[in-house]
């Protein structure tokens, strides 16, 4: 299924049913009085977070979501049937905005979270309500109210504990494949990963976390170079970023400049994202002699004046990945997840 993380949709709640103008008519009761029933309330439109839904692609084909109208009231004090609510499943991590005002309407995080995005109109009143000591045969009723209608923007931000950063071909997809059951496409050309991938990393039977891989960034991504920064939003809910660095790039590029380019793109996209905890992960150490790999890693650390955690791994050979995953689990358990 195609991955879609943004959609626009119009929602229309049902109108309330009109009140009924009716009088009791029975044999031997010539003046039975009013017996008009109320209309039914209009149905509302709800979004519900559903863990079986992974993308907003359905909204590309269904741009109008409409709940049922309430039915009009009837004689003999019978109320009209309420319009049926429209319940629409959306992925966990869906944020809903008013398209015109950009107002945040709600965030659906946990399975079962429910958000009313258009409320149904109230029912109209039958003429029974307007009977009084001075008006025994009222001919007054009220109309049902119109249901709410609005244009919405839906945005999906994946729910993950750890996010992967790096240039194309840094080895992010290989890493997530090595430590989880995720199966992203892996090859030796740029932009193999075209859409975000999630993987569940289990360090023990009951200890696990979710890791997100997004398409690689390149310098100028904020201006639209490469695949741009459109997928960075999927890292905004993470607790920690792993910056995967290729220490043996085939094109001979400078890893320090590559790291600085990624940091620059992060800062231009979001200060909040750029300030998240970030660990450096030097990948592909198996391609260099141990002493050369050690010297190159230390040179990068010195030039960056890096003070944070550093790991040296070979994702393809699963070298150093187990320790990294256990340390990630410990970090996440110490710093309880907050979205």
Curated annotation (Swiss-Prot):
Residues 1-159 form the Obg domain. Its cofactor is Mg(2+). The keyword Nucleotide-binding applies. Residues 127-147 are annotated as: Disordered. It is found in: Cytoplasm. Monomer. An essential GTPase which binds GTP, GDP and possibly (p)ppGpp with moderate affinity, with high nucleotide exchange rates and a fairly low GTP hydrolysis rate. Plays a role in control of the cell cycle, stress response, ribosome biogenesis and in those bacteria that undergo differentiation, in morphogenesis control. Belongs to the TRAFAC class OBG-HflX-like GTPase superfamily. OBG GTPase family. This is GTPase Obg. It comes from Coxiella burnetii (strain CbuK_Q154).
């Amino acid at each position: 299924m195609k991955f879609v993380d943004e959609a626009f949709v119009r929602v229309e709640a049902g109108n309330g049913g009109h009140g009924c103008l009716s009088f009791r008519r029975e044999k031997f009761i010539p003046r039975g009085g009013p017996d008009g029933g109320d209309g039914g309330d209009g149905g509302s439109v709800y979004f519900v977070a559903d863990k079986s839904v992974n993308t907003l692609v359905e909204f590309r084909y269904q741009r109008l979501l409409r709940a049922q109208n309430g039915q009009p009231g009837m004689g003999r004090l019978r109320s009209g049937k309420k319009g049926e609510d429209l319940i629409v499943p959306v992925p966990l991590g869906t944020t809903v905005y008013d398209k015109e005002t950009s107002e945040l309407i709600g965030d659906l995080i946990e399975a079962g979270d429910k958000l009313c995005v258009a409320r149904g109109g109230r029912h109209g009143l039958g003429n029974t309500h307007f009977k009084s000591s001075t008006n025994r045969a009222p001919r007054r009723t009220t109309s049902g109210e119109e249901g709410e209608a609005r244009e919405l923007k839906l945005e999906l931000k994946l729910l993950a504990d750890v996010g992967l950063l790096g240039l194309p071909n840094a080895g992010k997809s290989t890493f997530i494949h090595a430590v989880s059951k995720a199966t992203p496409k892996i090859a030796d050309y740029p932009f193999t990963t075209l859409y975000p991938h999630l993987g569940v990393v289990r360090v023990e039977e009951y200890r696990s976390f979710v890791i997100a891989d997004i398409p690689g960034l390149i310098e100028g991504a904020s201006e639209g170079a490469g695949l741009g920064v459109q997928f960075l939003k999927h890292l905004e809910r993470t607790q920690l970023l792993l910056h995967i660095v290729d220490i043996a790039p085939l094109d001979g590029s400078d890893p320090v400049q590559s790291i600085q380019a990624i940091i620059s793109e992060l800062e231009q996209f979001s200060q909040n994202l750029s300030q998240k905890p970030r660990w450096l992960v030097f990948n592909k150490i198996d391609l260099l002699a141990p002493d050369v790999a050690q010297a190159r890693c230390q040179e990068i650390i010195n030039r960056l004046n890096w003070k944070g955690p550093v790991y040296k791994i070979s994702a393809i050979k699963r070298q150093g990945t187990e320790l990294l995953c256990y340390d990630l689990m410990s970090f996440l358990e110490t710093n309880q997840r907050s979205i």
